[in-house]
Amino acid sequence: MAKQRVINIRGTSGSGKSTLIRRLVELYPEKEPVHVPDRKQPLFYKLRGDGLLPLSLLGHYETACGGCDTIPSMDRIYELVRERLAEGDSVLYEGLLISAEVNRAVALHTDGFDLTVVRLNTPLELCVDSVNQRRWAKNPDKPGVNPKNTEAKFKQTLATCKKLDAAGIPVVEADRDGAFHAIKQLLEA
């Protein structure tokens, strides 16, 4: 049996988390959306491909922003991580809200799961620009975002990754392309 991995991508708004996920999904020829009652969009996707770990990708990606930000609570996200691991899959998950979480990630690590955190080190100015581009694609008349919110999340993500590293969890810091290659290597069976 292939080794199971848990891979958590972290970054502020506009850092490229969802875009990175979409790029990683393309590695897998088999993509099965898993729906649950009372939820329009998939709760997660089962991804399969030769030479790659069987993978559950949490959340949905039917909109510009996706991932765990589409799951109602932090408790449900981490229940789902553990459920998918119990089923034999590796797990890939990301989201803005999850980027600030520490305790549940440390609990996964303490319980012996092979967790790797990948922090996107996209420059703050590029993150703000990406958020504005996404915003203006929906409504060109909207004003730009207040960069203070993005900056606060940027700092918070950096601080939480330092805590995870101090807890013994491997934290890989990379730009968008470097993160793709690091995660691709982790997913190779």
UniProtKB/Swiss-Prot annotation:
Keyword set includes Cytoplasm: no
InterPro entries, sorted: P-loop_NTPase
Reaction catalyzed: 5-hydroxymethyl-dUMP in DNA + ATP = 5-phosphomethyl-dUMP in DNA + ADP + H(+)
Superkingdom of origin: Viruses
Keywords: Host-virus interaction, Inhibition of host innate immune response by virus, Restriction-modification system evasion by virus, Viral immunoevasion
Gene Ontology annotations of biological process type: symbiont-mediated evasion of host restriction-modification system; symbiont-mediated suppression of host innate immune response
Entry similarity comment: Belongs to the thymidylate kinase family. 5-hmdU DNA kinase subfamily.
Function text: Phosphorylates 5-hydroxymethyluracil (5hmdU) into 5-phosphomethyl-2'-deoxyuridine (5- PmdU) on DNA as a step in the pathway leading to thymidine hypermodifications in the viral genome. The phosphate is added internally to the DNA polymer. As a final result of the pathway of hypermodification, 5-AcNmdU substitutes for a subset of thymidines in the viral DNA. These modifications probably prevent degradation of viral genome by the host restriction-modification antiviral defense system.
The protein, known as: 5-hmdU DNA kinase
Protein species of origin: Pseudomonas phage PaMx11
